[in-house]
């Protein structure tokens, strides 16, 4: 459907052929000029109908196309929803208008690092056999790309000590960063006093909590 946009009147001699040049309108296809002879009663009318142009509209994020298409000028802009793990969407560059503009346009997503991305720390304790068993798991939050260090767990230092330095890493956008922290059992020396007798060994070294077999003392008389 067409609606009247503007009109203008001109004068010319009766029976002369006129061919007014159509105006150029942004976003519309310019029609070909029409010719007509001027009537003596002033009823001569030339109508120009402008069809809307179509333009290529593309939305991209991090080099990948989110959506693209060819859309009619002035119609509602089909703006897509963009998502990127570990980031907050801040809008499109350039800013998106409500309707399709009169030119081919590429819009690029603008992102900001999210500050609530999870990373995981798993704590392992050494058992009596010298193997490690998962004791607890903690979920922390950080900013995408942030360098973080695992927290130290408050175990009784009479029983356990850190095997190595606390690990560090970069918070992954997809929440995949996992720290594994190991605690060894403390080792203690155990002495045996035979009180004047003799034993096969006077000292043993053992992990906390492990079974220790005491030597049998021997004493003459």
Indicate where each model-derived feature is located.
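Secondary-structure capping and domain/repeat boundary segments
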Residues: 1-221
């Amino acid at each position: 459907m067409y609606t009247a946009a503007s009109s203008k009147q001109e004068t010319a001699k009766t029976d002369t052929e006129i061919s007014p040049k159509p105006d150029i309108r942004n976003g519309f296809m310019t029609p070909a000029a029409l010719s007509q002879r001027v009537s003596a009663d002033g009823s001569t009318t030339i109508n120009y109908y402008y069809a809307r142009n179509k333009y290529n509209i593309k939305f991209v994020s991090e080099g990948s196309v989110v959506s693209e298409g060819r859309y009619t000028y002035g119609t509602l802009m089909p703006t897509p929803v963009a998502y990127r793990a570990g980031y907050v969407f801040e809008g499109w560059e350039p800013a998106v208008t409500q309707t399709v503009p009169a030119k081919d346009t590429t819009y690029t997503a603008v992102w900001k690092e999210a500050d609530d991305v999870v990373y995981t720390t798993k704590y392992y304790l050494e058992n009596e056999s010298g193997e490690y068993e998962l004791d607890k798991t903690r979920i922390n939050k950080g900013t995408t790309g942030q360098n973080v260090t695992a927290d130290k767990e408050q175990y009784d230092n009479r029983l356990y000590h850190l095997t190595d330095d606390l690990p560090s890493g970069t918070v992954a956008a997809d929440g995949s960063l996992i720290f594994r922290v190991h605690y060894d059992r403390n080792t203690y020396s155990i002495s045996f006093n035979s009180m004047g007798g003799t034993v096969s060994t006077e000292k043993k070294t053992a992990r906390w909590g492990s079974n220790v077999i005491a030597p049998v003392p021997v004493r003459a008389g």
